[in-house]
């Protein structure tokens, strides 16, 4: 992500919120958080999202209007499980030389992704995978500590609910239903 970019983050869980923060820290001009769960969309602005959408279709209309048809520079897929069909929607959200970054893990049996190869070539769009943000721990961790210490990186705010060990099943239910960004079990 570069300063001035329009960024779409699909999936506003823990990884998505950190992608939103990364885009904010990198200087993105507009950051759209896409998630069907209202609670997560509401939380996203606190991490740096400038806009939210409940679906990819809603995000496309919003981004198209915001950019006067130019579309996003980057779309980051941070959904819990990636499906091959998500790439077509993500590619449709980015404009010329747009980049799609996939952080979500796909199902082992799913071996194909979808999208227009013609559009990908004509508009020089890119798709890439990223594991752990493609980080370099010896370089990145000291920088992240500096950002956290300066109040620019929100980590404590990611924990939206704490559970006792007796509440572990409730914690799993909340995780599955999207009622948390991150839950913490204290024992």
Where are these regions (language model features)?
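A generic alpha-to-beta junction signature in SAM-dependent methyltransferases
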Residues: 1, 67, 93-95
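Mid-domain Rossmann-like dinucleotide-binding core that forms the NAD(H)/NADP(H) cofactor-binding site
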Residues: 1-57
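Glycine-centered, small-residue-biased loops immediately flanking beta-strands
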Residues: 5, 98-99, 125
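C-terminal hydrophobic helical "lid"/dimerization subdomain
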Residues: 57, 88-92, 96, 134-187
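Short amphipathic alpha-helix with an adjacent loop that forms part of the alpha/beta core around
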Residues: 59-69
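N-terminal Rossmann-like NAD(P) cofactor-binding module of classical short-chain dehydrogenase/reductase
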Residues: 76
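Short strand-turn motif at the edge of the Rossmann-like AdoMet-binding core
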Residues: 79-80, 103-107, 131-133, 158
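Rossmann-fold NAD(P)-binding glycine/threonine-rich loop
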Residues: 105-124, 141-144
């Amino acid at each position: 992500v570069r300063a001035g970019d329009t960024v779409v983050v699909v999936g506003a869980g823990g990884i998505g919120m950190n992608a939103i923060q990364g885009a904010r820290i990198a200087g993105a001009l507009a950051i759209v958080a896409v998630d069907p769960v209202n609670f997560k969309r509401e939380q996203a602005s606190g991490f740096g999202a400038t806009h939210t959408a409940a679906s990819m279709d809603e995000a496309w209309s919003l981004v198209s209007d915001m950019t006067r048809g130019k579309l996003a520079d980057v779309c980051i897929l941070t959904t819990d499980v990636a499906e091959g069909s998500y790439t077509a929607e993500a590619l449709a959200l980015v404009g010329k030389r747009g980049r799609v970054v996939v952080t979500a893990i796909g199902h082992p049996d799913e071996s194909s992704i979808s999208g227009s190869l013609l559009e990908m070539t004509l508009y020089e769009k890119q798709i890439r995978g990223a594991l752990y943000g493609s980080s370099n721990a010896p370089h990145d961790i000291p920088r992240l500590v500096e950002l956290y210490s300066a109040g620019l990186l929100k980590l404590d705010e990611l924990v939206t609910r704490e559970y006792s060990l007796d509440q572990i099943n409730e914690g799993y239910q909340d995780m599955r239903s999207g009622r948390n960004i991150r839950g913490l079990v204290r024992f």
